[in-house]
Amino acid sequence: MFNKHVKTFQYGNQTVTLETGEIARQAAAAVKVSMGDTVVLVAVTTNKEVKEGQDFFPLTVDYLERTYAAGKIPGGFFKREGKQSEKEILTSRLIDRPIRPLFPEGFYHDIQIVAMVVSVDPEIDSDIPAMLGASAALVLSGVPFAGPIGAARVGYVNGVYVLNPTKAELAKSQLDLVVAGTSKAVLMVESEAKILPEDVMLGAVVYGHDQMQVAINAINEFADEVNPELWDWKAPETNEELVAKVRGIAGETIKEAFKIRQKQARSAKLDEAWNAVKEALITEETDTLAANEIKGIFKHLEADVVRSQILDGQPRIDGRDTRTVRPLNIQTSVLPRTHGSALFTRGETQALAVATLGTSRDEQIIDALSGEYTDRFMLHYNFPPYSTGEVGRMGAPKRREIGHGRLAKRALLAVLPKPEDFSYTMRVVSEITESNGSSSMASVCGGCLSLLSAGVPLKAHVAGIAMGLILEGNKFAVLTDILGDEDHLGDMDFKVAGTTEGVTALQMDIKIQGITKEIMQIALAQAKEARLHILDQMKAAVAGPQELSAHAPRLFTMKINQDKIREVIGKGGETIRSITAETGTEINIAEDGTITIAATTQEAGDAAKKRIEQITAEVEVGKVYEGTVVKILDNNVGAIVSVMPGKDGLVHISQIAHERVRNVGDYLQVGQVVNVKALEVDDRGRVRLSIKALLDAPAREENAAE
């Protein structure tokens, strides 16, 4: 019934198994990948016909996590999985990025990849198995795909690279890097690091690429065994006559356009060139394929002009050489009521970054397959249509916005203060108000400045820069601080963020095969040069953390004995509610007895702290207290005196006065304030007090007989 094929190979410390032919047999190809107890099912479906009017490659990648994979039932009213989580979106992008450039130009058939996590080992992340499964399934589907690709996670523990580290190993690692590529070249890198030098980062990329060859070879052997039927697809031949026509109509106008330094004016000139081509060559009778071909030729002409100018040593689109960073303008504390803010402008790219401080109750609760955890630092990136001068729909953040926000967050994680040194929850929002290349790196710079503006004691300043590449044969040029057009028309998008000491985040997307270690080395060195230049200007604008905003909450931390937690909370929360209501504060108590008080003023925080200290204080034997009589005991036993909140003691009738007391009520009344001395605290915490001990003893009466 099943034509099942299985391939097993050793990958680092893990055994990987690829299976096909048993599940999802109606898909173009389906592969089940197992790594330890983590199992991912990847299915690829295709459309043999191109849709009418299709002028781009419609590749869709969806990575989905099922809660049953971890033995859980989803929360919420409907009890089923809903929209994709941030982890699912980021992993979908991780699969998409190295695969997309391996499809041939002019291939416009629908391809859908669905990677579904059906079992999860808490120690093994499902992203690497999902990437390997997508690679294998695409090869088995027979589509024109220049793969397979391999993927590897690289850690760095005690100066040694670790292949596919477990969750426990990652906790000790200075690096979390995912690299993907073919047998010949690296295509994608995504990483965060704890301020590592460039040579260590490059070494990790090379190490990961070397190690993934095992996976690539295994997928090739797997495909040879399955022997899939390949698509009979050929790239359309170049119509040289049509190319000449388009060049004749628009060639000179395109060259003139790329001499214009200002983006909007340049775009208008390019529109003029395209409109001339449309008028001359596209009519109502022109079919979609022909129109797409003309559009493709026009785009190629644009790329040829820009690329040839740069490789010939001519100035770039905006007049710069290959190493110059665009002019910078930095302003901090630009918004009066926010906790911290910065306006970071680099050329025609601008980010308004705003930092907000909160308490531990503001931490984001993340219900992941591996277990629930909280996140004290959030960075959200917004890219409104007006940032590029366009009209567009506003709505929920798109995958690109999620990805850019995550990259900026990873860049800043290494310099955040430890929770014990700075117990605030931090949120940064980066509003991209102008965009012409590298807005994610502007978010890194702006995010760092806004946190410093908010008074966050960062370990160091962090800046980011985007690098580009033009490669033709043996000639290449590495570009510093790329524009949007250079990103679209170039061969690489290489983003590096870090401090003066090293790299904190690295992201690389390569559109061609053939990027060498030498090119990556030059790009990293050039990026460091640019990063240090930006850092100098950032430090000149704000040298270190500023004073905490008057509008930010003040956090006061104190530690109490765990046995006292119940007393601070009170019966049904009565005590803690009264403290928060009376002082206007917010109080959070951890299981270990750490108390965090959030207050709008120093006075309110001090008042709440004093109340808690009074509740948790122990009565000291021999100490004098000012107390209040709260009860006169029956049978003339004595009185109960409250010496501090929640702490009462007994003044026995014999301890009220030196003379004989016949009636307690003759000496004490409820509500009366008296000074008492603590005589004893027994094993059960009961307190014995004395008023008499503080009174002068009466002089002895002389014998009357004398």
From Swiss-Prot:
One of its GO terms (biological process) is mRNA catabolic process. Its EC number is 2.7.7.8. GO terms for molecular function: 3'-5'-RNA exonuclease activity; magnesium ion binding; polyribonucleotide nucleotidyltransferase activity; RNA binding. One of its GO terms (cellular component) is cytosol. Its cofactor is Mg(2+). Its main location: cytoplasm. Keywords: Cytoplasm, Magnesium, Metal-binding, Nucleotidyltransferase, RNA-binding, Transferase. Mg(2+) binds at D487, D493. It is found in: Cytoplasm. InterPro entries: ExoRNase_PH_dom1 (IPR001247), ExoRNase_PH_dom2 (IPR015847), ExoRNase_PH_dom2_sf (IPR036345), KH_dom (IPR004087), KH_dom_type_1 (IPR004088), KH_dom_type_1_sf (IPR036612), NA-bd_OB-fold (IPR012340), PNPase (IPR012162). NCBIfam families: polynuc_phos, PRK11824.1. PANTHER family: POLYRIBONUCLEOTIDE NUCLEOTIDYLTRANSFERASE, POLYRIBONUCLEOTIDE NUCLEOTIDYLTRANSFERASE 1, MITOCHONDRIAL. This is Polyribonucleotide nucleotidyltransferase. It comes from Neisseria meningitidis serogroup C / serotype 2a (strain ATCC 700532 / DSM 15464 / FAM18). The lineage of its organism: Bacteria, Pseudomonadati, Pseudomonadota, Betaproteobacteria, Neisseriales.
